[in-house]
């Protein structure tokens, strides 16, 4: 009977029929199987311990499409829980291929969301056959055990034939020099040459990078020169020099040395600075006027009884705002009630007939 584990994401509660549908599909495809289910967060925190090499298949259910990443620690735990050739499938991410391979899984050729735990390959020892007489070392190799090579000292007769200054050599009595050993030596030599070539090519590329770092961009020099003072880089011709050796403060009428352009540039900068200052002052004045207007609206003007009292111009000592009503129309205001009447003396009783009609 197959053992199947369902790892549920916490957001699976949003769909109550999702897990039941997955279990129904398992019964149709596998038949009689032992199905377990756990929340993936509890497995990650270690609250639920899973037995190693137990489950034939692990299915990850995650309805959250925007977040399906799996940490490397959980991948390792799932790998240890599966049996050999077990499958880890479901809502798996497709952008973690490197983590999958580093853990030990193999991505299925037919389905990107199916990871397979490969069966370990057993190592097989292959004995090497040597030419020549069979020695004790070869016998031990055929029996499955490896023996150390035996060395013997050269005889004195062979030493006399060789140069007296040459050191005493040792010979390996366990094996003779064969063609296979020569081939192996040639292979090792080629590998060594390839390694040397790779090392020197890498060092050359590093030197080229260092040389590129020392190169100065010409555009940077131009930018630095533009930041200098324009007057310091100005070359004044001899015809523009003053006899006492001083420099001209203003450009000539027909300036050709560039001083006129510098003055125009400085004037434009000064004008723009003044415009910005005036603009800020106008803006601040407008804001202050708006604040004063709002403050006046919040505090309405109220007149007292003394301000609203009527003034009797016929009484001596009491005059209007202008104090010239008795002198005639030439000295009266636009709204004066005595307009059209002849002049009168202060204290004289004057009756106004039209005033009653208005009331």
From Swiss-Prot:
It holds the Pfam family CIAPIN1. The keyword Nucleotidyltransferase does not apply. One of its GO terms (molecular function) is 2 iron, 2 sulfur cluster binding. Residues 322-336 are annotated as: Fe-S binding site B. InterPro entries: Anamorsin, CIAPIN1, Dre2_N. Residues 152-187 are annotated as: Disordered. One of its GO terms (cellular component) is mitochondrial intermembrane space. Residues 159-228 are annotated as: Linker. Disulfide bonds: none annotated. [4Fe-4S] cluster binds at residues 322, 325, 333, 336. A motif (Cx2C motif 2) lies at residues 333-336. It is found in: Cytoplasm; Mitochondrion intermembrane space. Belongs to the anamorsin family. Component of the cytosolic iron-sulfur (Fe-S) protein assembly (CIA) machinery required for the maturation of extramitochondrial Fe-S proteins. Part of an electron transfer chain functioning in an early step of cytosolic Fe-S biogenesis, facilitating the de novo assembly of a [4Fe-4S] cluster on the scaffold complex CFD1-NBP35. Electrons are transferred to DRE2 from NADPH via the FAD- and FMN-containing protein TAH18. Monomer. Interacts with TAH18. Interacts with MIA40. This is Fe-S cluster assembly protein DRE2. It comes from Scheffersomyces stipitis (strain ATCC 58785 / CBS 6054 / NBRC 10063 / NRRL Y-11545) (Yeast). The lineage of its organism: Eukaryota, Fungi, Dikarya, Ascomycota, Saccharomycotina.
